[in-house]
Design a protein with these regions (language model features):
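Helix-to-loop junction immediately C-terminal to a conserved catalytic motif
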Residues: 52
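Conserved ABC ATPase "signature" region
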Residues: 100, 104, 111-128
Length: 133
């Protein structure tokens, strides 16, 4: 059995011609505490965002709990907690899709919770958004 809870293999993120993270290989052992240190712009936040599926890597792989992260997000994410700099959301998803994820993580599976949350901030819950529920 693999002793590593998080692994990356040549993890890379490019924004156009700018490389933010280059061929990163991390091996985090179960039960250990690690930190990412570096100057501003060193790629710490980008690395964390890739580990959580918030930002897609340009290339490379992420393995969490011995499973490839890509394709297993729904099984892996409920077992992970992370706060990067400030509370956030998944920028590649709609507001309704973000609310659905956060509701499910809290065990709130009924679409009424999302509808109520949108109504609280005076946003309309449309039949279009029901497609994602």
């Amino acid at each position: 059995m693999n002793d590593y809870i998080i692994e990356t293999h040549n993890l890379t993120k490019k924004y156009g011609s700018q490389t933010s993270v280059s061929h990163l290989n991390i091996h985090v052992k179960k039960g250990r505490i690690y930190g990412l240190l570096g100057r501003n712009g060193a790629g710490k936040t980008t690395t964390m965002r890739m580990l959580l599926g918030l930002t897609a890597p340009t290339s490379g792989e992420v393995t969490i709990f011995g499973k490839p992260f890509q394709g297993n997000e729904k099984n892996i994410l409920p077992h992970i907690g992370c706060l990067i700099e400030s509370p956030g959301f998944y920028p590649n998803l709609t507001g309704t899709e973000n609310l659905k994820i956060f509701a499910e993580l809290r065990g709130l599976r009924s679409p009424k919770y999302i509808k109520n949350a949108l109504e609280l901030v005076n946003l309309v819950y449309s039949t279009c958004s029901q497609h994602f529920l």
